[in-house]
Amino acid sequence: MEELGRVRLSDPDALLPAGFWAAVTVWLERPQVANKRLCGARMEARGRTLRSHAQAECGPRQGQGHGLEREPGQASPKGEPESGPRASREGTAPAADLNSLWDRVSQSLVHANPEMLAFLCGPSLGPQPEAAQELDLILRTVIPKASPHSPLTEPKKELVVQDVSSGSVTFLPLEEDNEGNLEVKTSNVYQLHLHHNEGEWFISVLIFCPERWHSDGVVYPKPAWLGEELLSKLARWAVENRKSEFKSTLSLVSILRYSRMYQELKEKYRDMVKVWPEVTDPEKFVYEDVAIATYLLILWEEERAEKGVTTKQSFVDLGCGNGLLVHILSNEGHPGRGIDIRRRKIWDMYGPQTQLEEGSITPSDETLFPGVDWLIGNHSDELTPWIPVIAARSSYTCRFFVLPCCFFDFVGRYQRQQSRKTQYREYLDFVLEVGLSCGFHVQEDCLRIPSTKRVCLIGKSRTYPPSAEVWMDEQRTRYLHSRQGHPQSRPGGAHAPSAPQTAAHDAGLQDSCRTVNAGSECVLEGLAAERGAGAPAPGLWVPGFCPREKAERVRNCAALPRDFVDQVVLQVANLLLDRKKFNTGNSEARSLKPWNGGGSLSLAEVAAELNSETLQRLKRECGGLQTLLKNSHQVFEVLNGRVHIRDWRQELQRGKPPEAKQNLSAAVFKTRICWFFAHHPDGCVLPAAQCPFAHGPEELRLSQTLKKQRQAP
């Protein structure tokens, strides 16, 4: 036995020992969080036996009530986390199999490997109640990421033994013998151990047989990784005083099936990255849509199996954007189409089999899809809360999948009212509330995509029978009307009175008032209708809804007026220069006079110095203040959330071209006035010959773009 590492824990919030077991649960059920070469783990079965039985006889006694059984809902011992939802959903091994496996393993330890038995059980931490004298047994399958670089790596089974009384959890890798029976692979047994000594807590990682450890680099990492990387993550998780607001990733689908299909689709559609004609990041968007398509294909595959049908589901993607998701789903045999208000260049590359339509969707009786199985809203913006409503009214069998991103209400922007929740969590609860009010059983899951907003909501079934459709639609209408009664921002700050909400809601959701952005033209139309300017047009469900503009508005601060940008840049620069930081540089070619490089401020500190009107104007742009400062890269350097004055002497000393100089080719050299020459109290830190910007109008050159424009007939 060898201890690979030990770390002392600081526990000011008194989270231990429960925090240790919470950390173990993460490694047990979601090992991919620590080991990026894994796709996840599947909990096959759970059981429990008395610790004393394991020590004395290494097996459960018959007729004593402490044998092994599948128990996904049973309460865990105090200090130990509950089993997750995926454990009960994915567990496939019957109780008898786990019982038989433990009996065989424990008997072999008694007769052939008593040292491992001592390693497994260890000493008790002291007198414990009977519940804490039990061993929890878990059979899990560790699933590696499918990859062309490691095609031979297969899922591995492990028997995990959790001993709360000794503060240990032991991982016993399993392999099949010649007869197909599972037995312990003694070379790769390791243990996580929680110690309490003289008022201090420690976590350690131990290996039973270090000289025989075999690392495959995926499921079985090197011992150094266990003693350093894994141990440090466990130590951090154990004392984190926070609870996730969201479900586990991929909790509603088979992780093994997902891993294999994702790799297949990734290989199949990877060439899209090379020919991507849009200005967006090709790798992010291609692989994100591949991941979403993988999830939907498995979800629909399992749905067909549940219903005993073979016909592939049809779909409509509302607000389909680049259309790649529609293209993949169609190529994989699902009939469907995508609709978006603006055509994309890449649409022409898909071919006629991918049906994409340019058009707007206004929620009304004219925009129903009665023959469609699924409606999809993938970052569908203003249509997101409407998709459950459209699905519910299209047909009783229509289902929906939404992946919310931007926060929209039925009319205009959604604005939060609950400070106890994050804005994202509150918006998800709102969309969940819409689904419930429309009569859906709504499920929530987290996708594995490169995005901070990766929670999807799924409505697969209804809460009412088909015979109650007329009554249920009346409830939907009341709910929509009640949403219009929520306070809306009027000019001058007055609010419309709030009407009571009459639709039924899930008991776990908080009633809240939500306001609409007063600056939106859509809201003004809604207010006009509310004041008697007109009722909804025939067939429209609410007044005031406005689809997004067909022409995409540039929102990266590039379209802001030049004088506004110059004013903000000068104000922020003066704030930094006031925090004087003089330096002289060490090059003989430059002046040795002191030059004020200024101090640094966090983005929050900079924002606190700007007036509310400026902040509101920046807030309407993507990235806001940070984007404006990064765009002004001649003047500023933004690193780790802090703003600095850029020192061009340091830029010239760097080995690779700096961020601010990467685009300063010969074509743009001296085509703009040097900001430091014009505004810095000490002037530019570089001589005119070395500065890529013009020191005065006499140095200005005409850019190549303007030259071509002037030469054109």
Swiss-Prot record:
Regions of compositional bias (Basic and acidic residues) in chain numbering: 79-89
Q: For this UniProt entry, which residues form the secretion signal?
A: none
Q: What is its EC number?
A: 2.1.1.211
Zn finger spans (C3H1-type): 669-698
Query: What reaction(s) does this enzyme catalyze?
Result: uridine(44) in tRNA(Ser) + S-adenosyl-L-methionine = 2'-O-methyluridine(44) in tRNA(Ser) + S-adenosyl-L-homocysteine + H(+)
Q: Which SUPFAM superfamilies match?
A: S-adenosyl-L-methionine-dependent methyltransferases (SSF53335)
Q: Name one GO biological process term.
A: tRNA processing
Which residue ranges are recorded for the region named Disordered? 49-92, 480-508
Instruction: Give all Phosphoserine modified positions.
Output: S76, S489
Q: Which PROSITE patterns match?
A: ZF_C3H1
For this entry, the protein name equals Probable tRNA (uracil-O(2)-)-methyltransferase
- Which species is the source of this protein? Mus musculus
Question: Source taxonomy lineage?
Answer: Eukaryota, Metazoa, Chordata, Craniata, Vertebrata
